[in-house]
């Protein structure tokens, strides 16, 4: 055996080097995939407390690092078109005697949601943390109001049909230059006398590819321009 190894030493040495190279390549791949998994942002959008339209819309950060929630966008797809609203900030309509009730509601929301500050969901979200942005019913009513749709209970009036509600979050992750995002679509189902809401997909869609992040940049610019225009109109009125 030793004579055979001595005679074929060069070939054995080459095979040994190739085997060692393969082991190191596999080891490097494992390290790379482990590093990428730890660095990959992971955000979830789910229903909480209930399973119908009264459920809370919960955003969870399952990433290894904190994320900064910059925008929360909701899109209501209807038979009369799509309504898109930036719901990052809460809006309240005041009537006589509403000040105390809204203050109590604000305090309650602040206790149950870790980010709400001065009526805004914008801010950092720690790893393993979560925040609820509102109930799906409240989001639907807010978008219906902005779209000019009349509501009776959970149902739209005047022949309007609600098809789906999509929630999209735009965040800054760690030291990344471009934003990352996540979105999930929920479909309305007729469940008399109320209204049901079920996820259209089993998981939250991650928006982290290069072209998706560039699209999020353009959306941020559009949202900021819209905010500037609203501020200008308010100051002139």
Predicted regions and their residues:
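Membrane-embedded hydrophobic alpha-helical segments
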Residues: 2-34
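A structural detector for beta-sheet-dominated domains
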Residues: 46-48, 88, 136, 170, ...
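Structured domain cores in non-transmembrane regions
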Residues: 66-151
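Glycine-rich, aromatic-bearing surface loops/beta-hairpins
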Residues: 147-237
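Asparagine-centered strand-capping/turn motif at beta-strand->loop junctions
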Residues: 58-63
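Contiguous beta-strand segments within globular domains
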Residues: 49-56, 133
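Residues at beta-strand starts and edge strands
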Residues: 53, 67-70, 129, 161-165
């Amino acid at each position: 055996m030793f004579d055979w190894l001595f005679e074929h030493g060069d070939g054995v040495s080459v095979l040994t080097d190739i085997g060692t190279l393969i082991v190191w390549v596999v080891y490097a791949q494992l390290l790379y995939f482990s590093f990428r998994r730890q660095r990959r942002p992971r955000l979830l959008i789910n229903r909480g407390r209930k399973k119908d339209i009264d459920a809370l819309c919960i955003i969870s950060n399952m990433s290894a690092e904190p994320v900064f929630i910059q925008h929360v966008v909701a899109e209501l797809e209807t038979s009369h078109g799509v309504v898109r609203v930036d719901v990052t900030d809460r809006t309240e309509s005041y009537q006589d005697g509403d000040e105390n009730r809204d203050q109590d509601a604000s305090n309650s929301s602040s206790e149950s949601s870790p980010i709400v500050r001065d009526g805004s969901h914008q801010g950092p979200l720690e790893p393993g943390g979560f925040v609820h942005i509102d109930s799906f019913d409240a989001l639907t009513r807010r978008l219906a109001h902005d779209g000019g749709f009349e509501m009776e209970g959970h149902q739209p009036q005047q022949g309007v049909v609600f098809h789906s509600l999509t929630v999209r979050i735009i965040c800054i992750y760690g030291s990344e230059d471009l934003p990352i995002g996540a979105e999930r679509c929920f479909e309305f189902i007729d469940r008399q006398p109320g209204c049901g809401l079920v996820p259209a997909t089993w998981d939250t869609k991650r928006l982290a590819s290069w072209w998706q992040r560039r699209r999020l940049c353009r959306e941020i610019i559009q949202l900021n321009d819209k905010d500037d225009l609203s501020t200008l109109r308010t100051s002139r009125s």
